[in-house]
Design a protein with these regions (language model features):
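Active-site-proximal loop/helix segments of hydrolase catalytic cores
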Residues: 1, 10-27, 111-207
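N-terminal catalytic scaffold of extracellular/periplasmic and nuclease hydrolases
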Residues: 1-8, 36-37
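A local structural micro-motif
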Residues: 6, 81-84, 201
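Flexible, acidic/histidine-containing loops and adjacent segments that form or flank the divalent-metal
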Residues: 19-20, 24-155
Protein backbone atom coordinates (compact mmCIF):
# COMPACT_ATOMS: atom_id res chain seq x y z
CA UNK A 1 0.00 0.00 0.00
CA UNK A 2 2.98 2.32 -0.27
CA UNK A 3 3.61 2.54 3.49
CA UNK A 4 7.34 2.53 4.23
CA UNK A 5 7.48 3.87 7.80
CA UNK A 6 5.41 3.66 10.99
CA UNK A 7 6.07 6.14 13.78
CA UNK A 8 4.70 3.72 16.40
CA UNK A 9 3.89 0.00 16.32
CA UNK A 10 2.01 -1.35 19.35
CA UNK A 11 1.84 -5.06 20.19
CA UNK A 12 -1.01 -5.98 22.55
CA UNK A 13 0.09 -9.54 23.37
CA UNK A 14 1.81 -12.51 21.76
CA UNK A 15 -0.80 -14.80 20.23
CA UNK A 16 -0.08 -15.72 16.62
CA UNK A 17 -3.00 -13.72 15.21
CA UNK A 18 -1.60 -10.55 16.81
CA UNK A 19 2.15 -10.85 16.16
CA UNK A 20 2.32 -13.36 13.30
CA UNK A 21 2.68 -10.64 10.66
CA UNK A 22 5.48 -8.76 12.42
CA UNK A 23 8.20 -10.21 10.21
CA UNK A 24 6.40 -9.32 6.98
CA UNK A 25 5.87 -5.77 8.22
CA UNK A 26 9.50 -5.27 9.20
CA UNK A 27 10.71 -6.64 5.86
CA UNK A 28 9.49 -3.50 4.10
CA UNK A 29 8.52 -0.97 6.79
CA UNK A 30 10.76 0.85 9.27
CA UNK A 31 9.39 1.55 12.75
CA UNK A 32 10.25 4.56 14.88
CA UNK A 33 9.17 3.01 18.18
CA UNK A 34 7.93 -0.48 19.01
CA UNK A 35 5.74 -0.58 22.13
CA UNK A 36 5.36 -3.99 23.75
CA UNK A 37 4.42 -5.55 27.09
CA UNK A 38 7.60 -7.65 26.87
CA UNK A 39 10.94 -7.14 25.13
CA UNK A 40 13.13 -10.26 24.75
CA UNK A 41 16.75 -10.03 25.95
CA UNK A 42 18.96 -8.39 23.33
CA UNK A 43 21.15 -11.49 23.05
CA UNK A 44 18.26 -13.98 22.90
CA UNK A 45 18.54 -16.81 20.39
CA UNK A 46 15.92 -19.10 18.82
CA UNK A 47 13.79 -21.05 21.28
CA UNK A 48 13.58 -24.24 19.19
CA UNK A 49 10.05 -25.05 20.41
CA UNK A 50 9.86 -28.28 18.40
CA UNK A 51 13.16 -29.71 19.59
CA UNK A 52 13.52 -32.61 21.99
CA UNK A 53 12.68 -30.55 25.08
CA UNK A 54 10.19 -32.85 26.82
CA UNK A 55 7.61 -30.08 27.14
CA UNK A 56 3.87 -30.69 26.76
CA UNK A 57 2.15 -29.42 23.63
CA UNK A 58 0.61 -26.37 25.31
CA UNK A 59 4.02 -25.22 26.58
CA UNK A 60 5.56 -25.71 23.13
CA UNK A 61 2.81 -23.54 21.66
CA UNK A 62 3.83 -20.68 23.96
CA UNK A 63 7.44 -21.04 22.82
CA UNK A 64 6.29 -21.00 19.18
CA UNK A 65 4.47 -17.72 19.76
CA UNK A 66 7.47 -16.16 21.49
CA UNK A 67 9.80 -17.41 18.74
CA UNK A 68 7.47 -15.93 16.12
CA UNK A 69 7.75 -12.61 17.96
CA UNK A 70 11.45 -12.60 18.83
CA UNK A 71 12.70 -13.91 15.48
CA UNK A 72 11.81 -10.77 13.47
CA UNK A 73 13.32 -8.57 16.18
CA UNK A 74 16.63 -10.39 15.71
CA UNK A 75 16.49 -10.31 11.91
CA UNK A 76 15.20 -6.77 11.45
CA UNK A 77 16.24 -5.03 14.64
CA UNK A 78 18.08 -2.38 12.64
CA UNK A 79 14.72 -1.33 11.14
CA UNK A 80 13.35 -0.36 14.57
CA UNK A 81 14.45 2.93 16.10
CA UNK A 82 13.59 1.99 19.67
CA UNK A 83 11.92 -0.87 21.52
CA UNK A 84 10.05 0.25 24.63
CA UNK A 85 8.84 -2.32 27.14
CA UNK A 86 5.69 -1.01 28.81
CA UNK A 87 5.82 -1.64 32.57
CA UNK A 88 2.10 -2.38 32.98
CA UNK A 89 1.78 -0.57 36.30
CA UNK A 90 0.30 2.67 34.96
CA UNK A 91 -1.67 3.97 32.01
CA UNK A 92 0.43 5.25 29.12
CA UNK A 93 -0.81 8.42 27.37
CA UNK A 94 0.42 9.24 23.87
CA UNK A 95 -0.23 12.28 21.68
CA UNK A 96 -0.17 10.81 18.18
CA UNK A 97 -1.11 14.01 16.30
CA UNK A 98 -2.47 17.43 17.22
CA UNK A 99 -5.98 15.95 17.06
CA UNK A 100 -5.47 12.33 18.10
CA UNK A 101 -4.39 11.00 21.50
CA UNK A 102 -4.32 7.46 22.83
CA UNK A 103 -4.37 5.88 26.27
CA UNK A 104 -2.82 2.42 26.60
CA UNK A 105 -4.59 0.44 29.32
CA UNK A 106 -3.37 -2.65 31.11
CA UNK A 107 -4.77 -5.57 33.05
CA UNK A 108 -3.81 -6.36 36.63
CA UNK A 109 -0.38 -4.71 37.21
CA UNK A 110 1.02 -7.76 39.02
CA UNK A 111 0.64 -9.86 35.85
CA UNK A 112 3.36 -8.20 33.84
CA UNK A 113 6.46 -8.73 36.03
CA UNK A 114 5.45 -12.36 36.56
CA UNK A 115 4.95 -12.87 32.85
CA UNK A 116 8.28 -11.18 32.16
CA UNK A 117 10.09 -13.52 34.56
CA UNK A 118 8.70 -16.64 32.83
CA UNK A 119 9.57 -15.40 29.34
CA UNK A 120 13.06 -14.31 30.43
CA UNK A 121 13.63 -17.77 31.91
CA UNK A 122 12.52 -19.40 28.65
CA UNK A 123 15.05 -17.36 26.68
CA UNK A 124 17.74 -18.40 29.17
CA UNK A 125 16.86 -22.04 28.50
CA UNK A 126 15.07 -22.52 31.85
CA UNK A 127 11.78 -23.94 30.63
CA UNK A 128 9.24 -24.83 33.28
CA UNK A 129 6.34 -26.52 31.50
CA UNK A 130 3.81 -25.57 34.18
CA UNK A 131 4.79 -21.89 34.08
CA UNK A 132 4.68 -21.80 30.29
CA UNK A 133 1.24 -23.42 30.17
CA UNK A 134 -0.04 -21.02 32.83
CA UNK A 135 1.17 -17.92 30.99
CA UNK A 136 0.00 -19.29 27.68
CA UNK A 137 -3.48 -19.31 29.17
CA UNK A 138 -2.90 -15.82 30.58
CA UNK A 139 -1.90 -14.08 27.35
CA UNK A 140 -5.40 -12.74 26.81
CA UNK A 141 -5.67 -11.72 30.46
CA UNK A 142 -2.63 -9.49 30.02
CA UNK A 143 -3.69 -8.11 26.62
CA UNK A 144 -3.33 -4.36 26.27
CA UNK A 145 -6.30 -2.14 25.41
CA UNK A 146 -6.40 1.30 23.83
CA UNK A 147 -8.74 4.28 24.06
CA UNK A 148 -8.37 6.88 21.33
CA UNK A 149 -9.68 10.45 21.46
CA UNK A 150 -10.37 12.28 18.21
CA UNK A 151 -12.40 15.49 17.83
CA UNK A 152 -14.62 14.71 20.79
CA UNK A 153 -15.11 11.05 19.84
CA UNK A 154 -13.78 8.10 21.84
CA UNK A 155 -12.79 4.80 20.25
CA UNK A 156 -11.99 1.73 22.34
CA UNK A 157 -9.82 -1.10 21.01
CA UNK A 158 -10.32 -4.06 23.31
CA UNK A 159 -7.47 -6.31 22.17
CA UNK A 160 -8.18 -9.83 23.44
CA UNK A 161 -8.81 -8.75 27.03
CA UNK A 162 -11.31 -10.76 29.05
CA UNK A 163 -14.31 -8.75 30.17
CA UNK A 164 -13.86 -9.38 33.89
CA UNK A 165 -10.45 -7.67 33.75
CA UNK A 166 -11.96 -4.28 32.89
CA UNK A 167 -15.59 -4.21 33.98
CA UNK A 168 -14.42 -1.34 36.18
CA UNK A 169 -14.09 2.42 36.16
CA UNK A 170 -11.90 2.18 33.02
CA UNK A 171 -14.89 0.93 31.00
CA UNK A 172 -16.55 4.31 30.47
CA UNK A 173 -18.89 5.09 27.54
CA UNK A 174 -17.37 5.32 24.07
CA UNK A 175 -18.54 6.10 20.54
CA UNK A 176 -16.95 3.15 18.72
CA UNK A 177 -15.87 -0.21 20.13
CA UNK A 178 -13.54 -2.62 18.41
CA UNK A 179 -15.05 -5.66 20.11
CA UNK A 180 -12.52 -7.68 22.14
CA UNK A 181 -11.38 -11.16 21.16
CA UNK A 182 -13.58 -11.63 18.11
CA UNK A 183 -16.72 -11.11 20.26
CA UNK A 184 -16.13 -14.22 22.34
CA UNK A 185 -18.48 -14.57 25.32
CA UNK A 186 -15.60 -14.37 27.79
CA UNK A 187 -14.51 -10.98 26.44
CA UNK A 188 -17.78 -9.34 25.46
CA UNK A 189 -20.32 -9.56 28.26
CA UNK A 190 -23.61 -7.72 28.67
CA UNK A 191 -22.19 -5.94 31.71
CA UNK A 192 -19.21 -4.65 29.72
CA UNK A 193 -21.42 -3.46 26.87
CA UNK A 194 -23.71 -1.68 29.34
CA UNK A 195 -20.68 0.14 30.74
CA UNK A 196 -19.21 1.07 27.36
CA UNK A 197 -22.52 1.94 25.62
CA UNK A 198 -20.91 2.09 22.15
CA UNK A 199 -22.85 3.76 19.36
CA UNK A 200 -21.13 1.43 16.88
CA UNK A 201 -19.15 -1.79 17.21
CA UNK A 202 -16.63 -3.45 14.90
CA UNK A 203 -16.00 -7.21 15.08
CA UNK A 204 -12.97 -9.00 13.62
CA UNK A 205 -14.02 -12.50 12.54
CA UNK A 206 -11.26 -13.53 10.14
CA UNK A 207 -8.07 -13.27 12.16
Amino acid sequence: NGVTHLDILLLTHFHRDHIGGLGRVLETVTVGELLTPYAPPADSGPLDPDGDNGLPKAARNVLRCMDLYAGPLRRYGDRIGRIKELPGDRMECLRLTDDLTMDILFGEPALYPRQRAVYDAAFRGERNGYDLIHWGKSMNVSSLRQRLYYHGKEIVLGGDAYAHMWETQTATPCDILKVPHHASLSSTTRKLLRLLQPKAAVVCVAA
